[in-house]
UniProtKB/Swiss-Prot annotation:
Residues 221-244 have a biased composition (Low complexity). Phosphorylated. Oligomerizes. Interacts with UL7; this interaction mediates UL7 incorporation to virions. Interacts with UL14. This is Tegument protein UL51. One of its GO terms (cellular component) is host cell Golgi apparatus. Changing F92L: In strain: Nonneuroinvasive mutant HF10 and 17 syn+. It comes from Human herpesvirus 1 (strain 17).
Length: 244
């Protein structure tokens, strides 16, 4: 009777509680290198680095890591471009592109500062909203894939940095890829001599005689005879010089 009442009222011995450890989701092996690379580029800009568990804690954290990776890569690309543009010395080499180089530097500096501020706002601010960075992330990705910098500006930057075959120093002018034309030194341009081609002889026709044209004979006046001077010899014609 007591056992029946105990079973009904739950007075019996309780079974031992067993716990099962819940394992965290492990990313696939093919995605781990990309995640490690994303963590590396993002942690390089954060004062307090994040771990892989922090980045994969939830779907929102994973999305935040993807956005931060795009911003970090854009930031590093801007810094590399700024370093290369800094090699241009305004006023000394190619002064006509000083304005374009300064405009590129201002644009790259603003984009780099905005990327850095957005990454810090995403990870360091309390209650940061990810949607505030969506527009900037899309612009950063678009600027890397479809940059609004046209090819003429790229050519200007290459000429300023000396990265292409176009010669800028010394006032040389470029006549094409790999061809540099030196500036004129004030000498008049002498046209090449004209060459007249004789008509080709047909089959059976005789070839023209290659003899030069006859030069006019110029007679030299005979000096006046003198009783004491020796008798001069016969007059000679002036030599015929071709081309006169």
């Amino acid at each position: 009777m007591a056992s029946l009442l105990g079973a009904i009222c739950g007075w019996g011995a309780r079974p031992e509680e067993q716990y099962e450890m819940i394992r965290a989701a492990v990313p696939p092996s093919e995605a781990e290198p990309r995640l490690q690379e994303a963590l590396a580029v993002v942690n390089a800009l954060l004062p307090a680095p994040i771990t892989l568990d922090d980045a994969l804690g939830s779907l929102d954290d994973t999305r935040r890591l993807v956005k931060a990776r795009a911003l970090a890569r854009t930031y590093h690309a801007c810094m590399v471009n700024l370093e290369r543009l800094a090699r241009h010395h305004p006023g000394f080499e190619a002064p006509t592109i000083d304005g374009a180089v300064a405009a590129h530097q201002d644009k790259m500096r603003r984009l780099a500062d905005t990327c850095m501020a957005t990454i810090l706002q995403m990870y360091m601010s309390v209650g940061a909203a990810d949607k505030s960075a969506d527009v900037l992330v899309s612009q950063a990705i678009r600027s890397m894939a479809e940059s609004d910098v046209v090819m003429e500006d790229v050519a200007i930057a290459e000429r300023a940095l000396g990265l292409s075959a176009f010669g800028v120093a010394g006032g040389t002018r470029s006549g094409g890829i790999g061809v540099t034309e030196a500036p004129s030194l004030g000498h008049p341009h002498t046209p090449p001599p004209e060459v007249t081609l004789a008509p080709a002889a047909r089959n059976g026709d005789a070839l023209p005689d290659p003899k030069p044209e006859s030069c006019p004979r110029v007679s030299v006046p005979r000096p006046t005879a003198s009783p004491t001077a020796p008798r001069p010899g016969p007059s000679r014609a002036a030599p015929c010089v071709l081309g006169q």
